[in-house]
């Protein structure tokens, strides 16, 4: 068996990725989120598959098919709420995973990082089209508002929006194609995740010290496989607590009203995990400018490796940049809060200041502080 593990063409790949993989001996629980994202993806694909067996992607029956899943299908309510809250958990893990990468300088592995940014865009697209499927008020109006943003693209905008809609408004054709996209994209995510791992295993994992860990590696199994299992159980506990006690905590009550094109909800807002980007979009009083800022708020992650100025990889021994990092985290939380507030003062000005600070920190303040710390090292 031992020999088969190392010689069999298929088992050999698994062995090199999850069993005999040389791993730094000092990686903390912040390194658990990669495997937790894999767990989230598996949960989402499985629950999504069972939901798709009962869901109908037609405007006249979509809303009632979701109600039917919750009322009549065996444990349908459990599957539906695990899928809905699983998405929130997915994004929670993504944000912590990216935060870890920023803090410990994992972005210096540029291929892995860039594939990660592509993964983030794909997951965001999947979540967006998925939110439209229950065909409630917020589903319909969210789809209308967000797809409408593309009309800001000069010359081709209007044509592009009508092409995506499959008509002159969000309707039956839109819902059907969004269901198709929502079904296929998770498999694209799975493929990208494999490439993400492929590039990661070319260089090996980073570690909290940011130093080369080649002299001190241990096998992934049993050490980190068991450590990952602990993370799995804790995460499943959090998910089940959310699903069984407060399943609607993170949802919008408006989505329990069937979609009605003739009645606009008082506050159109996306799910909590998009609120920071939504706040940046709304902070610019120009449509095209807002769309560009929205895309830039995520795309800016591509620039992070290029803006690394410090002699040190992570922030473990850089107190000044550490302070700026936590200001960035606070700023993102502020943007998330603002995204859920109505467009009125003082929220408008707070959102604009938080948006400016967000871009300023990443592009200017953190790189300059890195240079300052380099000089301080020479004292």
Swiss-Prot record:
Please classify the protein's predominant subcellular localization into one broad category.
Answer: mitochondrion
What cofactor does this chain's UniProt record say it requires?
A: heme b
Q: How does it assemble?
A: The cytochrome bc1 complex contains 11 subunits: 3 respiratory subunits (MT-CYB, CYC1 and UQCRFS1), 2 core proteins (UQCRC1 and UQCRC2) and 6 low-molecular weight proteins (UQCRH/QCR6, UQCRB/QCR7, UQCRQ/QCR8, UQCR10/QCR9, UQCR11/QCR10 and a cleavage product of UQCRFS1). This cytochrome bc1 complex then forms a dimer.
GO MF term list: metal ion binding; ubiquinol-cytochrome-c reductase activity
**Organism ancestry:** Eukaryota, Metazoa, Chordata, Craniata, Vertebrata
GO cellular component: a single term: respiratory chain complex III
Question: What Pfam families does its record include?
Answer: Cytochrom_B_C, Cytochrome_B
Q: What is this protein's name?
A: Cytochrome b
Q: What does the UniProt keyword field contain?
A: Electron transport, Heme, Iron, Membrane, Metal-binding, Mitochondrion, Mitochondrion inner membrane, Respiratory chain, Transmembrane, Transmembrane helix, Transport, Ubiquinone
> What are the TM regions of this chain, as residue ranges?
33-53, 77-98, 113-133, 178-198, 226-246, 288-308, 320-340, 347-367
- Where a ubiquinone is bound, by residue? 201
Origin organism is: Ornithorhynchus anatinus
What job does the chain carry out? Component of the ubiquinol-cytochrome c reductase complex (complex III or cytochrome b-c1 complex) that is part of the mitochondrial respiratory chain. The b-c1 complex mediates electron transfer from ubiquinol to cytochrome c. Contributes to the generation of a proton gradient across the mitochondrial membrane that is then used for ATP synthesis.
UniProt-annotated location(s): Mitochondrion inner membrane
Q: What does the cofactor section's free text say about binding? A: Binds 2 heme b groups non-covalently.
An additional note in the Swiss-Prot or TrEMBL entry is:
Heme 1 (or BL or b562) is low-potential and absorbs at about 562 nm, and heme 2 (or BH or b566) is high-potential and absorbs at about 566 nm.
UniProt-listed CDD domains: cytochrome_b_C (cd00290), Cytochrome_b_N (cd00284)
| Family to which the UniProt record says this protein belongs | Belongs to the cytochrome b family.
Gene name in the database record: MT-CYB
Under the heading Gene3D superfamilies, the entry gives: Cytochrome Bc1 Complex, Chain C
Membrane topology qualifier: Multi-pass membrane protein
InterPro entries for this protein: Cyt_b/b6_C, Cyt_b/b6_C_sf, Cyt_b/b6_N, Cytb/b6-like_sf, Cytochrome_b, Cytochrome_b_C_euk/bac, Cytochrome_b_N_euk/bac, Di-haem_cyt_TM
Binding of heme b b562: at which residues? 83, 182
Q: What is a biological process (GO) this protein takes part in?
A: mitochondrial electron transport, ubiquinol to cytochrome c
Family annotation (SUPFAM superfamilies): a domain/subunit of cytochrome bc1 complex (Ubiquinol-cytochrome c reductase), Transmembrane di-heme cytochromes
């Amino acid at each position: 068996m031992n020999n088969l593990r190392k010689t069999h063409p298929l088992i050999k790949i698994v062995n090199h990725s999850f069993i005999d993989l040389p791993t730094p001996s000092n990686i903390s629980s912040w390194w658990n989120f990669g495997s937790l994202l894999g767990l989230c993806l598996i949960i989402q694909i499985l629950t999504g598959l069972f939901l798709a067996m009962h869901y109908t992607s037609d405007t006249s029956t979509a809303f009632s098919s979701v109600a039917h899943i919750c009322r009549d299908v065996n444990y349908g309510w459990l599957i539906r709420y695990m899928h809905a809250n699983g998405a929130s958990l997915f994004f929670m893990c993504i944000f912590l995973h990216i935060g870890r990468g920023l803090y410990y300088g994992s972005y210096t592995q540029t291929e892995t990082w860039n594939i990660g940014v592509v993964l983030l865009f794909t997951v965001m697209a999947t979540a967006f089209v998925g939110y439209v499927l229950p065909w409630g008020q917020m589903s319909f109006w969210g789809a209308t508002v967000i797809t409408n943003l593309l009309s800001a693209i000069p010359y081709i905008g209007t044509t592009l929006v009508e092409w995506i809609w499959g008509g002159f408004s969000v309707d039956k054709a839109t819902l059907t194609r969004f269901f198709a996209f929502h079904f296929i994209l998770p498999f694209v995510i799975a493929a990208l995740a494999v490439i993400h791992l492929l590039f990661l295993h070319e260089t090996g994992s980073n570690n909290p010290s940011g130093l080369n860990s080649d002299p001190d590696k241990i096998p992934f199994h049993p050490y980190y496989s068991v450590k990952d299992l602990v993370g799995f159980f804790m995460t499943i506990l959090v998910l089940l607590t959310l699903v069984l006690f407060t399943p609607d905590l993170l949802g919008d009550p408006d989505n329990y009203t069937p979609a009605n094109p003739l009645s606009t909800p008082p506050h159109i807002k996306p799910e909590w995990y998009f609120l920071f980007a939504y706040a940046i979009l709304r902070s610019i009083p120009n449509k095209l400018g807002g769309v560009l800022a929205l895309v830039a708020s995520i795309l800016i992650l591509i620039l992070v490796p290029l803006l690394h100025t410090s002699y040190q990889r992570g922030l473990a021994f850089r107190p000044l940049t550490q302070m700026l990092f936590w200001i960035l985290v606070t700023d993102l939380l502020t943007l998330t809060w603002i995204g859920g507030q109505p467009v009125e003062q003082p929220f408008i000005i707070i959102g604009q200041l938080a948006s400016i600070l967000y871009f300023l920190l990443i592009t200017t303040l953190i790189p300059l502080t890195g240079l300052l710390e380099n000089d301080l090292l020479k004292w």
